[in-house]
A protein has these predicted regions:
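SsDNA-processing nucleotidyl-transfer enzymes
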Residues: 1-4, 34-126, 130-133, 137, ...
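Short, conserved phosphate-binding/catalytic loop or strand-edge motifs used
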Residues: 162-172
Length: 294
């Protein structure tokens, strides 16, 4: 297969990776090839962790930090110091690399919140809103709206996306000098403030037994050693859903109506949304904002 002048060896296109829907490896590769123009800017320069599903979503998966040694010579890497020593991470700089990653059955792509050249400086503050049953994504929408209101009081813009799984994620772009030593305490303080304001609906503590019927505002992802699923990444669910940027009007509608059926997007729907709206997450890449004092 030739992708923008790069030659790739592609195999097992008919292999079913999502057994409930029959979605194949070939369709995964096609999705990533088509979404690449929009997705690659969100991956470019960032150390990338792959979550690979060689036998599909119903079978075992594994996370791969170290870029495979059998990679094509045109796949770029970045060496990053970690608790395990230096690791050469893949960098997804172009469509060909994204297609190669898909060929590895890396359904989920988890980039760093910072680019490799400025690894100590996250470009965003990220909040992962995770519902504890019977709470659901509607409850996440309501918490996301509270986050937006809180940030607006600080003069900050934020952007929402589905996780592609059970919840929502809210990103506050920074693209400046902030370090993780600032963003993580800030995120924790915001989560605790929301919990204080709505103790029956929000929890900020890590203990899972505290989450029943509440939305866990996970602030802990704001860490140099952690990653968050990329916007437009597929997820390993029963259907090939993807982490999808949302209009705030969609979040508001779900919070008001009590139903979030319209906030679940499979691969084809994501491509249609890009055709209609463009990249709703584009401002996250460039908007420069400063952290306020809490």
């Amino acid at each position: 297969m030739n992708v923008e002048g790069r030659t790739l060896s592609i195999s097992n296109l008919g292999k079913v990776l999502y057994p409930d829907t029959g979605f194949t490896k070939g369709e995964v590769i096609d999705y990533y090839a088509r979404v690449a123009e929009t997705m690659v800017p969100h991956l470019s320069g960032r150390p990338l962790t792959l979550r690979r599903f060689p036998n599909g979503v119903a079978e075992k998966s594994f996370f791969e930090k170290r870029c495979p040694s059998h990679r094509p010579d045109w796949v770029e890497t970045a060496s990053v110091e970690t608790s395990e020593g230096p690791i050469d991470f893949c960098l997804c700089q172009d469509r060909a690399t994204l297609v190669w990653v898909a060929q590895l059955a890396a359904l989920e792509l988890h980039p760093s919140l910072s680019i490799a050249k400025r690894i100590d400086h996250p470009t965003v503050v990220a909040f992962d809103l995770d519902p504890g049953p019977p709470a659901d994504v509607v409850d996440c929408c309501r918490v996301a709206l509270r986050l937006r209101e809180l940030f607006a009081n600080f003069g900050l813009e934020c952007f929402a996306k589905t996780s592609g799984s059970k919840g929502l994620q809210v990103y506050v772009p920074l693209n400046g000098k902030a370090r993780y030593e600032q963003t993580k305490p800030f995120a924790h303080a915001v989560a605790k403030l929301l919990e204080k304001q709505s103790p029956d609906e929000v929890v900020s503590k890590m203990k899972k037994e505290l989450r029943k019927g509440k939305v866990f505002v996970d602030w802990s992802q704001n860490d140099r050693a952690k990653t968050t699923v990329s916007v437009y990444s597929l997820r390993a669910r029963e259907q090939p859903t993807a982490s999808t940027p949302l209009l705030w009007a969609e979040v508001e509608a779900a919070g008001e109506s009590g139903t979030a059926e319209d906030l679940r997007f499979e691969a084809g729907a994501v491509l249609e949304r890009i055709s209609e709206h463009g990249d709703l997450f584009a401002p996250v890449l460039e908007l420069e904002q400063d952290l306020p004092d809490l």
